[in-house]
Curated annotation (Swiss-Prot):
Belongs to the phosphoglycerate kinase family. It catalyses: (2R)-3-phosphoglycerate + ATP = (2R)-3-phospho-glyceroyl phosphate + ADP. It holds the Pfam family PGK. Its main location: cytoplasm. Pathway: Carbohydrate degradation; glycolysis; pyruvate from D-glyceraldehyde 3-phosphate: step 2/5. GO terms for molecular function: ADP binding; ATP binding; phosphoglycerate kinase activity. GO terms for biological process: gluconeogenesis; glycolytic process. Disulfide bonds: none annotated. It is an enzyme of class 2 (transferase). This is Phosphoglycerate kinase. It comes from the Bacteria. Its EC number is 2.7.2.3.
Length: 391
């Protein structure tokens, strides 16, 4: 990868602007999950240790450009960052035209989405960002799929543009999983709709050895194979698409294994009566809400023999205890497998937390939309810009 890495640069005495993803949930001024702040600390510490004058910025929510509001302010983040770093972290409100910061100091620059032109990647604004620093560091993988002034434009104009440790760890893990995977490569793609994961399925089917589908997506594939799915969430108009994906897999010698048993209920409720049925016994009024134990065991065996596992999406309604066993079985199989494993996506991370397996997954992506776009085979604007500067 032709990207300049921040870890390789001499930053002594340099003004360094770091774009982090500090977009954390805040309720009544209280941060409810500080995972992203904690993740950013090593990068900031490293820049300080290297003797840099450090400026950090991030977006928070979706403020109106050109107006400051307390609810969109990074003030609670500055307080938390100061506690984690053990140094003062002043919040600078109007910073586009210049920032005072000395080597060994760090300042947090107010929510960059408040700046007029940020969202549309305005060149004048991007040049102003670039003029603030000697080195720009892009460390926000979660926004790498957005072409904005602080994630794309500034990379073009900064004297030096580098990838930060968080961003590079994410890119290295994804490259290891997709570009040069230990075989067999198995992907789990689950979710409510084929339509939302269509590009993902279409891209992965050309890379994987096994593709396990789950949730509403699986129901559409089950229907495409000629089985009844009752009242289950599925997309009849996408049956031809599902058949094409299956044909593409077969042509490559890859496999999309379908469930042989499922867990059904008559209502979509946490306390609904759950019944295990073979796939050909699903009634017209049944809802398929999980894979059955036989299927879960078969999938777990595939995971155990995989060299690489990419996991995006729980295979059942794991929030309801009666319909969580499929997802739990696969989660535990991933945790105990020797494969290189990468997990990403909001619901997937919730499952990782629920079953407490974070320490047993090789790499957990916090990238969200950027993670999905990478899996879809798309070029991420920030990554492309960093590669162009690294040539």
């Amino acid at each position: 990868m032709s990207i300049v890495r921040m870890t390789d640069l001499d930053l002594s005495g340099k003004r360094v602007l770091i774009r982090q993803d500090l977009n954390v949930p805040i309720d009544n001024g209280q941060i409810t999950s500080e995972q992203r702040i904690t993740a950013s600390v090593p990068t900031i510490k490293l820049a300080l240790e290297k003797g840099a004058a450090v400026m950090v910025t991030s977006h928070l929510g979706r403020p109106k450009e050109g107006s400051w509001t307390e609810e969109d302010s990074l003030a609670p983040v500055a307080t938390r960052l100061a506690a984690l770093l053990g140094v003062d972290v002043p919040l600078v409100r109007d910073w586009v035209d210049g920032v005072e910061v000395a080597p060994g100091q760090v300042v947090l620059l107010e929510n960059c989405r408040m700046n007029v032109g940020e969202g549309k990647d305005d060149e004048t604004l991007a040049r102003k960002y670039a003029a603030l620093c000697d080195v720009f560091v892009m460390d926000a993988f979660g926004t790498a799929h957005r072409a904005q002034a602080s994630t794309h434009g500034v990379i073009r104009f900064a004297p030096v543009a580098a990838g930060g440790p968080l961003l590079m760890a994410e890119l290295d893990a994804l490259a290891k999983a997709l570009d040069n995977p230990a075989k067999p490569l198995l992907a789990i793609v689950a979710g409510s709709k084929v339509s939302t994961k269509l590009e993902l399925l279409s891209n992965l089917v050309n890379k994987v050895d096994q593709l396990i589908v789950g949730g509403g997506i699986a129901n559409t594939f089950i229907a495409a194979a000629g089985h009844a799915v009752g009242k289950s969430l599925n997309e009849p108009d996408l049956i031809p698409t599902a058949n094409r994906i299956v044909a593409d897999a077969k042509a490559r010698g890859a496999e999309i294994p379908l469930p042989t048993d499922v867990v059904v209920a008559k209502q979509f409720l946490p306390d609904a009566q759950a019944s295990v049925k073979s796939l050909d016994a699903v009634d017209a009024d049944d809802l398929i809400l999980d894979i059955g134990p036989q299927t879960a065991q078969r999938y777990a065996e595939l995971i155990a023999s995989a060299g690489t596992v990419v996991w995006n999406g729980p295979v059942g309604v794991f929030e309801f205890e009666s319909f969580s066993h499929g997802t739990e079985t696969l989660a535990r199989a991933i945790a105990s497998s020797k494969a290189f494993s990468i997990a990403g996506g909001g619901d997937t991370l919730a499952a990782v937390d629920k079953y407490d397996i974070a320490q047993d997954v090789t790499y957990i992506s916090t990238g969200g939309g950027a993670f999905l776009e990478f899996l879809e085979g798309k070029t991420l604007p920030a990554v492309a810009a960093l590669q162009a500067r690294g040539q």
